[in-house]
């Protein structure tokens, strides 16, 4: 027998190298075979419910790292709630209608207008479902636990029917109406867009300063006066029908030197404008309030048949321009709102493709709107006072990445103004994480206009509206309920397969159709109405779910997207929000803080991460970042996370190895019988348990990450395990000292494995497979540990905190001795602590082997007054370090005066000799193979 065989060296097959890319799919297959999702639901049946409603990702293309952040975050919450005693069914969903799928088919050569519509829509459907399957596999590869066999998809007939029922309820309350208001118009998509489909980019535009000649000054301005206006969209001058001034703003009539014209500009902008216009000097002729100029008539710059009325508007400011806004009601929301008060013509001079229409005039007809600035400049002639290029934020179609325009076209709207205050009241009742989300959503709802819900596309849910012979729109509850039932049985495809009369209730009549003839709407619904009614199609429709949901979790862009649309529809129909709480997350940027894009080559694919590092590394990254703000990720960052993971894994591996001979049923030592340092570690660990449980409750994953890393690296690796191994290796296998520490090891191992399962499910499942004494087949079926408190715990923590300070001081003294070549490693040291009475009292109260804790072979405690001048001194304590006296025990590696060669060929100290002689009589009788001496 060899001497080292008398040591209790930990043994385990748990590998140091994780091999996650290969092992994770195996665990996922095992979970699926065991149907763990269903088992967890059955286990928690009848317990308090928690419902997180999944915001549906768009079913197109591979998932990106933003999807991963979102789905992993949800999975962490679902898993932590499930293991904390809640019934948490989680139904994943997909958004499957909309323009992007049409665009994909177009790129594949599919020509929609040359096909039978039903065939085209079936192609859209099949493509969408193929993307659902692809993304489902991607999400499952990330370890996301969900009801994957029963997801919701917005193209499902039942979902479409429930969506129609939401529309019908809103229509029944009078919230759906048709109007020709200006809407965001995408010429590249040939469709109206909702606010949520807009993104902003900075662009350069040519802005023009020009003047309208006064035609009727109403006795205030004479006809030789010109009102100066500014525009950043020259094409809209073709539809300008008014000039808006601020009612309380001051305007001056000035005559530049050498000019026979006089001009009206805002007083607050005159100096800057004079410089732009080259007015070296000017004479001020009069001053007027904006309200005094109301109803003055001016001439259109080139169309003599058009008069432009001076009107009043509160949206006019002195931030830029001239303080006078040219007003084209067909091309802007403010223009429309103020223009309709004065009954100005709502002229639209750009068609659906962005081309100037015939009513713009022969010089413009057929030209692309963004290319007509030179024509406008030419038409203005000497009325043009200045032009300049400005850089400003401009709206773009989020899908095509092309600029859009405001354009008044007949559209269907969902009113927001009719019940805006009700929505705002519901926001006040909702909990937000982070808290600033409340203000953000509140302001968006407060300031938003009505919602344009119609789209001039094919792939989507049809608007269930019919028209009588006299043009009356029909969307009564009877009709929409009937359409909903048809969709539920046949899918929305039936809308395109049947004539209007066959889609209406049998025997339906309407006074507007004396001949019984009807037509149907050909527009479809905004896809945000699809997902925005999911509270009805999912949470309210499934028996195992509930409405309102406990939580909606999405990116911060969804304040103007899904959070917004869901809130509007839910309050409109039922008077309350669809959620009790909202958690929003920032965007995922690259390692330099830049937006990810194919052109930059900085996109991180979750699939690539899973192949290189494993999904658990990506999951640990999610837990490591502050998602309240934008977060950064790169392969380098993931490499750093992987290194942290390695430290956690290897520490837990040490615990597995050193509890391999520990049976909790027979070997556990009661807390009261633990050693002082073991009690301290138990208390510290239970504080960690409390921190983690609280952080899960608050969805604060970063706190969990930091707390676990600190506990593993500082409390365990750098302190407790650093000296505990000398006990568990050296002491007799069944000794009280060893079993005490193993009790703490095992308690930490089992509980931290459970606590980390929501974040690292593959790794903890692997660890769990080595914990043969635990009853649950899978750790996911276990319950989260509760934090315990202990008597005198605060006093214990205070005492050990003081010791940690002393330990740091002692380590400094040992380091100085090491540098002076007095010792090599700390076990070569004889440390003398010169202590004040207070420090002596502390060391006595700790009731511990201080030499063991400081990892020195010999320790002496002396009076502080006896400290030599060269001692390493601190307040109340000083240290000297000498080389320990004696020989190195081959078994304990400590220097001990009692170390000597024994009769059984072992060069060991008395303590090790006693252990050997009591526990290895055969070796004592036969002698060890080699002594090393």
From Swiss-Prot:
Entry EC no(s): 6.1.1.5
Chain sites annotated for binding ATP: 598
A molecular function (GO) held by this record is: isoleucine-tRNA ligase activity
Q: Which Pfam families match?
A: Anticodon_1, tRNA-synt_1
Q: Give the residue ranges of motif 'HIGH' region.
A: 57-67
Query: Would you name any one GO CC term?
Result: cytosol
User: Where, by residue number, does L-isoleucyl-5'-AMP bind?
Assistant: 554
Location, primary (coarse class)? cytoplasm
What does the entry give for GO biological process?
isoleucyl-tRNA aminoacylation
At which positions is motif 'KMSKS' region?
595-599
Keywords assigned by UniProt?
Aminoacyl-tRNA synthetase, ATP-binding, Cytoplasm, Ligase, Nucleotide-binding, Protein biosynthesis
Which EC class heads this enzyme's classification? ligase
Where does the source fall among the domains of life?
A: Bacteria
Catalysed reactions, semicolon-separated: tRNA(Ile) + L-isoleucine + ATP = L-isoleucyl-tRNA(Ile) + AMP + diphosphate
- Localization (cell): Cytoplasm
InterPro entries for this protein: aa-tRNA-synth_I_CS, aa-tRNA-synth_Ia, Anticodon_Ile_BEm, Ile-tRNA-ligase, Ile-tRNA-ligase_type1, Ile-tRNA_ligase, M/V/L/I-tRNA-synth_anticd-bd, Rossmann-like_a/b/a_fold
The family assignment reads: Belongs to the class-I aminoacyl-tRNA synthetase family. IleS type 1 subfamily.
This chain's function reads: Catalyzes the attachment of isoleucine to tRNA(Ile). As IleRS can inadvertently accommodate and process structurally similar amino acids such as valine, to avoid such errors it has two additional distinct tRNA(Ile)-dependent editing activities. One activity is designated as 'pretransfer' editing and involves the hydrolysis of activated Val-AMP. The other activity is designated 'posttransfer' editing and involves deacylation of mischarged Val-tRNA(Ile).
Record PANTHER family: ISOLEUCINE--TRNA LIGASE, MITOCHONDRIAL, SOLEUCYL-TRNA SYNTHETASE
Q: Know anything about its domains from the record?
A: IleRS has two distinct active sites: one for aminoacylation and one for editing. The misactivated valine is translocated from the active site to the editing site, which sterically excludes the correctly activated isoleucine. The single editing site contains two valyl binding pockets, one specific for each substrate (Val-AMP or Val-tRNA(Ile)).
| Quaternary structure and partners | Monomer.
Q: What is this protein called?
A: Isoleucine--tRNA ligase
Report the source organism: Streptococcus pyogenes serotype M3 (strain ATCC BAA-595 / MGAS315)
Q: What gene does this protein come from?
A: ileS
